[in-house]
């Protein structure tokens, strides 16, 4: 079930991020915790939960029209959770809005799964970036 994230989800989201932090260039727990709390307060975070297990989470910015984080539990990957979370966020925008996301650069194998997922949802490469000394790619 996908729903808006609540303040009491923060610890589960932190635990999930610890499992997948290597998938996020420049991840820092303190900065993530602060950003997560702000997104929850603004209604800009969703979680996918099955019984007591947090399967995935997504955060976004209405102002920037961007997905800012998307994480799926390693045991729940390839089940369509990321796609459902992306489409849930897309439903928060107007159809003509262009939503962006940043992931690892095209030549970085750490971003292969994420890029495939984003592309299956209609995202296309727009520009190459560097974040925290890591080559990345912006998709829209």
Residue ranges of model-derived segments:
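Acetyl-CoA-dependent GNAT
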Residues: 4-69, 73-75, 86-87, 92
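Core SAM-dependent methyltransferase catalytic element
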Residues: 139-140
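Conserved active-site alpha-helix within GNAT-family acetyltransferase domains
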Residues: 83, 106-128
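Proline- and acidic/polar-enriched loop/turn elements at helix boundaries
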Residues: 29, 130-131
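Short acidic/glycine-enriched loop/turn segments that link adjacent beta-strands
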Residues: 132-136
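Conserved GNAT acetyl-CoA-binding A-motif
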Residues: 93-107
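A short, internal acetyl-CoA/4′-phosphopantetheine-binding micro-motif in the GNAT/acyltransferase core
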Residues: 70-81, 104-107
């Amino acid at each position: 079930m996908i729903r808006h994230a609540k303040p009491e989800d923060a610890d589960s989201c932190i635990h999930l991020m610890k499992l997948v932090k290597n998938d996020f260039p420049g991840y820092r727990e303190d900065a993530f915790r602060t950003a997560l709390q702000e997104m929850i307060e603004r209604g800009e975070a969703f979680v996918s939960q099955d019984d007591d297990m947090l399967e995935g989470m997504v955060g976004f910015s209405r102002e920037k029209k961007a997905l800012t984080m998307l994480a799926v539990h390693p045991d729940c990957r390839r089940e369509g959770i990321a796609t459902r979370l992306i489409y849930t966020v897309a439903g928060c925008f107007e159809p003509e809005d262009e939503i962006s996301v940043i992931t690892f650069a095209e030549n970085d194998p750490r971003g292969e799964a994420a890029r495939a997922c984003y592309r299956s949802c209609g995202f296309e490469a727009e520009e190459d970036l560097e974040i925290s000394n890591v080559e990345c790619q912006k998709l829209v």
